[in-house]
Amino acid sequence: MLLAPGDVIKRSSEELKQRQIQINLVDWTESEGGKENKTEPKEESKAEGSKDGEGTQSESGQKEEGGKETKDADVDRRIHTAVGSGSSTKGPGERANENADRGDGKVGGGGGDADAGVGATGTNGRRWVVLTEEIARAIESKYGTKIDVYRDEVPAQIIEVERSLQKELGISREGVAEQTERSRDLRRKEKNGTHAKAVERGGRKQRKESHGDAQREGVEEEKTSEEPARIGITIEGVMSQNKLLSMIGGVERKMAPIGARESAVMLVSNSIKDVVRATAYFTAPTGDPHWKEVAREASKKKNILAYTSTGGDAKTEFLHLIDHL
């Protein structure tokens, strides 16, 4: 039997049912002012909202969740950051659902074809890239789409994975820090005009070589003066899985569930009453106010196995532990 924080168990309830593992979940949210509904899966709230057009029959907690989801979606659509004077880009996330349903391999906003699931095409036929190797590996592992890492090329269209999606992909703290550092460095360079100056130097050299034709030189000078306004780096903040998939293509890979017969875990619980018969416990940052007491009592037991989150996504680590016990 495995002890774990209540919110981690609740987030993993569907996967635990697939594994035929029993759940003993002590509800801690009633005393917290009815916050229980905030942890309900988004899919359920969304489905109920679509069945009840007016939404008056939904519980207040589900209304809050629906509002939160809409707010997240709006923020996701707005969070487009064009650094410097890069080319204008329409947020691909605005047509995420349409592109996902269409299934023709075209990426929203780009108008290009994904090469058999390899790479990701953005606007103007250019490809989306990410800032770190860890993020590229996580995307390929989860969605089956190979995506390149930014190598200081200009122009470029960069996906910046934000907090909620970092957890979904299981990005480590080190990986998050590395992305933040690279993003800040790029913004600093673009603000100082590093990339624009490089373009202008190239234009001046070309004009010097063709100085014999005054008219041609004038046209070229006009063209070059406009070039820095068209060339730059676009950084697109991505919070949701749907938006990411609309940009890079691919689908989420579903891991084959491991049944209870293949796992040593038969029951998971957050109840202090189950400490007596527990054989292991998993601890992670949690919103379960009673978990601290449960973990303290569990740590007093002899011959109990203790596991701690490494700082990644607690749900992913919890299920990984269950599958390997």
From Swiss-Prot:
Annotated localization: Virion
Gene Ontology CC, one term: viral inner capsid
UniProtKB keywords: ATP-binding, Capsid protein, Hydrolase, Inner capsid protein, Nucleotide-binding, Virion
Comp. bias (Basic and acidic residues): 8-18, 32-54, 61-79, 92-105, 175-229
Positions with a binding annotation for ATP: 106
Pfam families cross-referenced by the UniProt entry: Orbi_VP6
A GO molecular function held by the record: ATP binding
The organism of origin for this protein: Bluetongue virus 13 (isolate USA) (BTV 13)
Enzyme class: hydrolase
Annotated stretches, region: Disordered: 1-127, 174-230
Superkingdom, taxonomy of origin: Viruses
Principal subcellular localization: virion
Segments of skewed composition (Gly residues): 106-122
Assembly notes: Homohexamer.
Function comment: ATP dependent RNA helicase essential for RNA packaging and viral transcription. Possesses ss- and dsRNA-binding capacity.
Family: Belongs to the orbivirus VP6 family.
EC number: 3.6.4.13
InterPro entries, per the entry: Orbi_VP6
Record flagged with keyword Phosphoprotein: no
Protein name according to UniProt: Helicase VP6-A
Reactions mediated catalytically: ATP + H2O = ADP + phosphate + H(+)
